């Protein structure tokens, strides 16, 4: 009988601490914030489950909580602003030049920043663009999300795009908005935070949050860039074929077929760290962003620049 040796869960082995569960995560964050008055930024990538995160971080017992969603421009303004990039075409669009500053209402932003400056105790700035709203934060937590999981959540109509309410839209339109607008905007800020975030979070499995230090994240990316590695493959049904992959890749035999296999697309695939036996997931794009020269070489970076 054929036995597949295909590794569906490749990972970089690491040693370090992983905080699991909301109680442990909140306790660690509170213990790291020793000052009487401090600002904690919780920056979120598009596609996170905000209801779960808000409930989970309630355990911080913040004295002042600012949700960046309340500072965004109205939905209709954001739709109008992003239309030239998203367009009406089902497939084609244009890569945006927008950044987070274009999404915020200037008056609300100024009021929020003044509130942050005058607040006492623990102030939490949560949501998309939180690190831009509070650039002088005492501690930065980044809640990441890989694009394959974003696509799965889009298919289940669980998430909205940046500043819009489009859960009911088809997954292809979600993907298009993400590709041309949302992910571009999120990645601009992420590139700045990869080198300085204090903590990094994996919430890809709902109800099972995990957190590591930013130092451990950067150590893992450096290690991965200097050794052979694989990104995490994913598979998807399609109208054609797919029986061969079931057998060779040890896939779910109950699915009708598998027509797609993505095994090296950094923009869409995940990267795993195996930290003392605990799997920690992130977008493999993080490696490309943080270790561009080490990963691709000097000539490639010099010719094409940062991704």
What feature does the model see in each segment?
Residues 1-35, 51-56, 60-61, 156-159, ...:
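NTP-dependent small-molecule kinase module
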Residues 2-20, 63-122:
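ATP-dependent small-molecule kinase phosphotransfer cores
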Residues 35, 59-63, 111-115, 128-130, ...:
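Catalytic cores of nucleic-acid editing and processing enzymes
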Residues 39-43:
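Short hydrophobic/aromatic beta-strand immediately N-terminal to the Walker A/P-loop
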Residues 47-48:
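ATP-binding Walker
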Residues 60, 110-163:
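ATP-dependent NMP and nucleoside kinases share a basic, alpha-helical "lid"
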Residues 146, 151-156, 163-186:
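Extended, regular secondary-structure scaffolds
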Residues 299-307:
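Short, intrinsically disordered, charge-balanced linker/junction segments flanking boundaries
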């Amino acid at each position: 009988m054929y036995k597949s040796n295909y590794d569906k869960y490749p990972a970089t082995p690491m040693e370090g601490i992983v905080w699991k569960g909301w109680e442990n995560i909140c306790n660690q964050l509170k213990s790291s914030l020793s000052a009487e008055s401090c600002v904690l930024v919780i920056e979120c990538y598009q596609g996170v489950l905000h209801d779960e995160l808000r409930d989970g971080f309630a355990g911080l017992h913040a004295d002042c909580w600012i949700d960046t969603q309340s500072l965004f421009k109205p939905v209709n303004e954001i739709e109008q602003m992003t239309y030239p990039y998203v367009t009406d075409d089902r497939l084609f669009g244009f890569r945006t030049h927008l950044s987070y500053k274009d999404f915020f209402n200037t008056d609300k932003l100024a009021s929020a920043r003044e509130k942050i400056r005058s607040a006492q105790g623990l102030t939490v700035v949560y949501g998309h663009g939180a690190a831009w709203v509070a650039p002088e934060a005492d501690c930065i937590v980044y809640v990441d999300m890989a694009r394959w999981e974003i696509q799965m959540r889009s298919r289940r109509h669980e998430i909205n795009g940046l500043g819009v309410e489009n859960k009911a839209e088809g997954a292809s339109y979600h993907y298009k908005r993400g590709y041309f607008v949302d992910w571009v905007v999120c990645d601009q800020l992420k590139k700045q935070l990869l080198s300085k975030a204090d903590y990094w979070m994996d919430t890809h499995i709902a109800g099972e949050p995990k957190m590591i230090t930013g130092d451990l994240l950067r150590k893992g990316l450096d290690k991965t860039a200097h050794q052979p590695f694989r990104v995490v493959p994913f598979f998807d049904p399609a109208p054609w074929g797919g029986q061969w992959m079931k057998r060779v890749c040890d896939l779910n035999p109950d699915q009708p077929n598998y027509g797609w296999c993505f095994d090296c697309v950094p923009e869409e695939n995940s990267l795993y760290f195996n930290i003392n036996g605990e799997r920690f997931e992130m977008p493999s794009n993080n490696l490309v962003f943080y270790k561009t020269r080490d990963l691709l070489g000097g000539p490639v970076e010099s010719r094409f620049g940062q991704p």
